[in-house]
């Protein structure tokens, strides 16, 4: 028998349907009837027939026709909203598409599994789990470690030993011993009281990352959760039942208590949850619709679910992976700009970078050579100015290896810290099964990821700062020798004038966001937790800075491609022509002014999906594998001893010299 979960004026009602031929209108009337039945005053109505209503699907808010048959219009166990005439949409009803969902592909239930052991999760793995590309299972070794850890907790309960967080209160209440008959209530109260975050909910993708990372940490076997409960958490993840987790409220020690409590709250059947099937709804109904039961917490399990740095680390993981992707592509975008501005490749000579051998600097210089080597990839644009009177380029072109290079090295440093944090036990107290005891410590403190993510924001921001200056050079006719703002009939058309302003605004905003949050601390929990990391804000603002970098480079990419239009029929190198073709597949050239924001977003999407890298990477790697000799073309302004000797041979001797 099909059944539907119907939301009417803040209440959720389970409505069974014996006949799929019944209509949407019948479902609405039956839901209203049940709603009236539960109200002492019949909800203010005298009869069901007088109530006028509309029926929406919760998923996507699609309006349903009252005459449609239920078996055609809805799926079994689907969630719907009945909006009564005169009412607005119920105030506690949350749209089923939170902000940020557009960043990733639509959810499709994955077929592949990733086995978590608590020791080997990578940043790329976690991002893919967030995107819904894998389900989760535990390794057999992880299952055994979890069971052994739980046996220690069971012994503590049996022997009535006083242990923090298991048989005592929390924080300032650490010395308050809890009676044995209230230990389960203690854990539920912990989750409820600590679910005190505010702000917008995490997107489903980010909530998946958060939940997956918490599962990985629990799989290490140092938290004392039971295998039964952990498997219930995994089942919720695999069904994509995701709790409402507000983005604000963590100070980053003792761990990310507020967001992780919201995560646990949904798992125990309270608060809101989201799934692709239901959209947002009460957690108990979302779980039930997927054949799952709310978790019944055992002693220590509430604490095991909420104590750790997983909010900081999961958001930081996304920031890190996106920073890595945009840093690679920034080299390609900058190389394209250098071609348009008729810059020289002399500054990327291997000897220059060999005497200052920072790894990132050397790699960036190599990428520029692989993309701009006109002898290997003939460039008509480069040949058009090979012999010119320009001695050297501006810093924004000449110093790309040094500026972009340190960003790459920063990302590598941060990745090492975040990868360690992904596979670290950050609970308190820690359960050591091999010793048969628990030990209180401070692994929950988020200083490591907080400091690393502050550093990431500072480092990656510089890609946008230097990109904005290159956009200025492209738009300024006195610097580019191109039409002002890269458009014909300037004055009638404004071209990239305000797109450049947008880039400047993003760079300026990021400067404020680069102020480290981890230099701040406030004492909390009655001075028990008297130093905190503020890592949650470090992670969130790192993500915002990375997004700004992507958007600024999207504008530069469009500007550089537009600049090429004014150099035609000359062509650039093969890999850069491929990048140009990629951009033109989604954004046409500007002949005159048009609505520009969608084009910026289209270019942003190319960078976000790493399409620019995918196009250029084969040429970069081929150049690397073939060990192509470096070409060093001479120009009248290039000084060398060899050229000096040649010139000396042509100077006639004179008695006066």
From Swiss-Prot:
Keywords: Disease variant, Histidine metabolism, Lyase, Phosphoprotein
GO molecular function, one term: histidine ammonia-lyase activity
Residues bearing the modification Phosphothreonine: 396, 637
Reactions mediated catalytically: L-histidine = trans-urocanate + NH4(+)
EC assignment: 4.3.1.3
Enzyme class, broadest EC rank: lyase
PROSITE patterns: PAL_HISTIDASE
Pathway field: Amino-acid degradation; L-histidine degradation into L-glutamate; N-formimidoyl-L-glutamate from L-histidine: step 1/3
A Pfam family annotated for this UniProt entry: Lyase_aromatic
Residues in cross-link 5-imidazolinone (Ala-Gly): 253-255
Post-translational modification: Contains an active site 4-methylidene-imidazol-5-one (MIO), which is formed autocatalytically by cyclization and dehydration of residues Ala-Ser-Gly.
GO cellular component terms attached to this protein's record: cytoplasm
Coiled coil: none
Family: Belongs to the PAL/histidase family.
Name listed for the protein in its UniProt record: Histidine ammonia-lyase
Record organism: Mus musculus
């Amino acid at each position: 028998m099909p059944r539907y979960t119907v939301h009417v004026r803040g209440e959720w009602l389970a409505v069974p349907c014996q006949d799929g031929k019944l209509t949407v209108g019948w479902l609405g009337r039956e839901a209203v009837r049940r709603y009236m039945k539960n109200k002492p005053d019949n909800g203010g109505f005298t009869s069901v027939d007088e109530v006028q209503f509309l029926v929406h699907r919760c998923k996507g808010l699609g309006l349903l026709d009252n005459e449609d048959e239920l078996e055609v219009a809805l799926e079994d166990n689907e969630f719907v909203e009945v909006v009564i005439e005169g009412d607005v949409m119920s105030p506690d009803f949350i749209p089923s598409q939170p902000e940020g969902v557009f960043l990733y592909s639509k959810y499709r239930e994955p077929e592949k599994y990733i086995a978590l052991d608590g020791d080997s999760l990578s940043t790329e793995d976690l991002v893919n789990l967030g995107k819904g590309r894998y389900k989760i299972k535990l390794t057999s070794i992880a299952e055994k470690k979890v069971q052994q850890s739980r046996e220690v907790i069971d012994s503590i309960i049996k022997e009535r030993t006083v242990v923090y967080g298991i048989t005592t209160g929390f924080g300032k209440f650490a010395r308050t011993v809890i009676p044995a008959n209230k230990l389960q209530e203690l854990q539920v109260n912990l989750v409820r009281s600590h679910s005190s975050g505010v702000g917008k909910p995490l997107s489903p993708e980010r909530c998946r990352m958060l939940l997956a990372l918490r599962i990985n940490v629990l799989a290490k076997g140092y938290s004392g959760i039971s295998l039964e409960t952990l498997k219930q958490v995994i089942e919720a993840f695999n069904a994509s039942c995701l709790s409402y987790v507000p983005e604000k409220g963590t100070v980053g020690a003792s761990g990310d208590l507020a967001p992780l409590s919201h995560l646990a709250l949904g798992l125990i059947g309270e608060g809101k949850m989201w799934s692709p099937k239901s959209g947002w709804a009460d957690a108990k109904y979302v779980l039930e619709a997927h054949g799952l039961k709310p978790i019944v917490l055992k002693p220590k399990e509430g604490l095991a679910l909420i104590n750790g740095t997983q909010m900081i680390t999961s958001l930081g993981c996304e920031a890190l992976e996106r920073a890595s992707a945009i840093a690679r592509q920034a080299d390609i975008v900058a190389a394209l700009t250098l071609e348009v501005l008729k810059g020289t490749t002399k500054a990327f000579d291997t000897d220059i970078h060999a005497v200052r051998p920072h790894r990132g600097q050397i790699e960036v210089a190599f990428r520029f050579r692989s993309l701009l080597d006109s002898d290997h990839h003939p460039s008509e644009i480069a040949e058009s100015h090979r012999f010119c009177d320009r001695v050297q380029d501006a810093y924004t072109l000449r110093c790309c290896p040094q500026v972009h290079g340190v960003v790459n090295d920063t990302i590598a440093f941060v990745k090492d810290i975040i990868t360690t944090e992904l596979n670290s036990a950050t609970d308190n107290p820690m359960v050591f099964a091999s010793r048969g005891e628990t030990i209180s410590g401070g692994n929950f403190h988020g200083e490591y990821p907080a400091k690393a993510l502050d550093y990431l924001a500072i480092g990656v921001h510089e890609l946008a700062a230097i990109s904005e200056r290159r956009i200025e050079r492209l738009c300024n006719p006195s610097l580019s020798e191109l039409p002002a703002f890269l458009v014909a009939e300037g004055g009638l058309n404004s071209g990239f004038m305000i797109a450049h302003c947008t880039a400047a605004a993003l760079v300026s905003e990021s400067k404020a966001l680069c102020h480290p949050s981890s230099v701040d601390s406030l004492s909390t929990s009655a001075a028990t937790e008297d130093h905190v990391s503020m890592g949650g804000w470090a992670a969130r603002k790192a993500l915002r800075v990375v997004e700004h970098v992507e958007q600024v480079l999207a504008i530069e990419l469009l500007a550089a491609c537009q600049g090429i239009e004014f150099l035609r029929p000359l062509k650039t190198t093969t890999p850069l022509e491929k990048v140009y073709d990629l951009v033109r597949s989604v954004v046409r050239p500007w002949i005159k002014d048009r609505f520009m924001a969608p084009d910026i977003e289209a270019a942003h999407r190319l960078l976000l999906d790493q399409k620019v890298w995918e196009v250029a990477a084969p040429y970069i790697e081929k150049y690397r594998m073939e060990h192509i000799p470096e070409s060093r073309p001479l120009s009248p302004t290039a000084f060398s001893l060899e050229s000096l000797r040649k010139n000396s041979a042509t100077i006639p001797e004179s008695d006066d010299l």
